[in-house]
Design a protein with these regions (language model features):
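Cys-nucleophile CN-hydrolase/nitrilase-fold catalytic domain and related Cys-dependent amidase chemistry
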Residues: 21-117
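Active-site micro-motifs of SAM-dependent methyltransferase domains
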Residues: 15, 50, 164
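Active-site catalytic loop in hydrolytic enzyme cores
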Residues: 85, 103-169
């Protein structure tokens, strides 16, 4: 059953040039710890927040879009493990920072991950691309997912014009 009230913490923080992936994991851990201590049950990180990792992967990677997309995509399992552990440790739901995820045919999607206190719940590929995403060659997702959680149904990356369809379903 869903709680009557749901405390949500939305991350708004400066994007930093990190020298290593561990520093970025530490930043996530501090933010999750502070939000959970303040009573947040659901934590949301920024869209494309995972691209902050590109700086920790080296200047040559950070300055090359193709290299950044691939490197951040390759690093996502490490981020997934860290966020899954943080969700378990703090008993919160986390909408992790989205980022590029490699798909068949060498294409990338903008994938958002949702983690429950039990671990990873699922992944939603963004379906409606912005002009810059089209310029980058980011492919749209093809399926809208609804995640059943202890705090209720959650839909990620939802364009406003689809909301009516979801509510009526």
């Amino acid at each position: 059953m869903s709680p009557q009230r749901l405390a949500i913490a939305a991350a708004q923080y400066p994007v930093d040039l990190r020298s290593e992936l561990g520093a970025y994991r530490d930043k996530l851990a501090r933010w999750v710890g502070e939000a959970a201590s303040a009573g947040a049950q659901m934590l949301a990180f920024p869209e494309y927040g995972a691209m902050e990792w590109a700086g920790a992967l080296g200047v040559s990677v950070a300055q090359d879009l193709s290299a950044s997309l691939q490197a951040v995509s390759d690093a996502m399992p490490e981020m997934d493990a860290a966020l899954s552990e943080l969700a378990r440790r703090h008993g919160v739901h986390i909408l992790g920072p989205s980022g590029p995820q490699g798909r068949a045919g060498g294409r990338f999607v903008n994938a958002a991950r949702l983690f429950a206190p039990s671990g990873r719940v699922g992944v939603q590929d963004k379906m409606i691309m912005t002009p810059f995403e089209r310029d980058w060659g980011i492919a749209p997702g093809t399926q809208l997912r609804v995640f059943e959680t202890a705090i209720g149904r959650i839909v990620e990356c939802l364009p406003a014009h689809l909301l009516r369809e979801i509510v009526l379903a």
